[in-house]
Amino acid sequence: DGQPSEFCDLYATLIRKERFSDRFNGKRIAINRIPEVTLMLVILNILIQCIVAVGEIGGKESALMNMMVLQIGKFVQKPEWWRLVTSVFLHFGWDHLFNNMLVLLYLGALAERCLGKWRFLGVYLISGIGANAASVWWYVHQGDLLVATAGASGAIFGIAGLLLCIVLLSKGHFEEITLRQLIFMMFFTLYHGFAESGVNNCAHIVGAIIGFVCGIIIFCQMKKNRAEGR
């Protein structure tokens, strides 16, 4: 699910110290450092890419790449369910990795600080796994059994969908992340995904839907907890 290089210019303008209003506890929080789970996810993805790159020295195939990638045809013949998870942390080259991690640093920091590390991590993993499962169904339905898919963008779209839901349900929740900005970011990504070949648009769309649904569930639960004084 490779991301176009245009993301670098778009999101580089967004990576800066931000402030947003936390309506759940009435505090203002400054994003002046990267939250721990977001940072760990970025480090893990970079570490895996380094190992893959070392394994490909001399034109060889990386054993780790073969172990983690989600190859549709092979998965259908012999379902190795862990690949629905491992492929979320695997990328096809440094450009693919850099584009995804740049977005994750920004959106992940917002989501993790707003919702807490465990809710954030849960939505990230559920969105990524769900996006991969949907991708298997989609490519089998299309007859594209030779497709191999990997990347964090399904999970990242889940975080974008989560934030979109929260912004819609609590107007003005984020001072620096507006509804218009989120919609533009997602539309921009999808547009270039459909305009270019080799992009897993199914993962993007399904990831966003899963994240949005998770956002509804989390928002309602947090409102309930606040009403009950918990």
Stretches found by the model and what they are:
Residues 2-3, 9-230:
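A detector for small-residue-rich transmembrane helices and their helix-helix packing motifs
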